[in-house]
């Protein structure tokens, strides 16, 4: 099934805004073109979402999910339309680790040196975001290419051993002592 995932904690306002944007602005366009598509809005506190009690066609609110492997296995793409907030974009790094294609916004991609069209897709305009979502849902090959490149990037860029050595090097340079 063509399934889109947004995963977050809905006690955090930027995730509330993102989920409501997907359900209210993007999903009607997707459903007009792909009536069998599904959107999973997963995560803690979904009752904080304005659209939670609505019966939106093709949208599921399963709440907190213990088994992320199973959730990602039935997901074709991950959409993270983040418009505010800071911090590390763990949801993007996690989706990339699962080799899932990622559709996000410029703010959603902040701090992650992935490139639009290479490891993920970035669109800030509502129509372009919806069109990119549809393109990904319809093109399994493109999904595989983006997902595989994203996974390769995350493995290389966020490698624990490599980052520990980098941090040690920074300490050595700053303190002038061997570690």
What are the roles of these predicted feature ranges?
Residues 1-74:
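Conserved catalytic-core segment of nucleotide-activated headgroup transferases in glycan assembly
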Residues 63-64, 80-86, 107-108:
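Short Ser/Thr-rich beta->loop micro-motif in glycosyltransferases that lines
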Residues 106-117, 121-122:
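Short acidic/histidine- and often glycine-rich active-site loop of Leloir-type glycosyltransferases
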Residues 120-127, 135-140:
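Conserved acidic donor-binding segment of nucleotide-sugar-dependent glycosyltransferases
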Residues 142-156, 163-169:
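A short, well-ordered alpha-helix in the C-terminal region of glycosyltransferases
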């Amino acid at each position: 099934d063509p399934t889109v995932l947004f995963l977050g904690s809905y006690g955090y306002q930027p995730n509330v805004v993102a989920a409501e944007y997907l359900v209210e602005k993007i999903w009607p366009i997707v459903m007009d073109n792909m009536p069998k598509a599904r959107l999973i809005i997963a995560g803690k506190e979904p009752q904080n979402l304005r659209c939670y009690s609505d019966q939106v066609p093709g949208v599921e609110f399963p709440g907190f999910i213990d088994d992320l492997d199973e959730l990602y296995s039935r997901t074709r793409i991950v959409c993270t339309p983040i418009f505010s907030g800071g911090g590390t974009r763990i949801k993007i790094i996690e989706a990339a680790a699962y080799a899932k294609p990622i559709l996000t916004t410029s703010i959603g991609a902040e701090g992650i040196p992935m490139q639009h069209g290479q490891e993920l897709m970035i669109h800030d305009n509502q129509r372009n975001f919806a069109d990119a979502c549809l393109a990904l849902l319809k093109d399994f090959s493109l999904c595989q290419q983006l997902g595989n490149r994203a996974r390769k990037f995350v493995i290389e860029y966020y490698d624990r051993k490599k980052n520990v050595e980098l941090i040690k090097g920074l300490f050595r340079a700053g303190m002038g002592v061997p570690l």
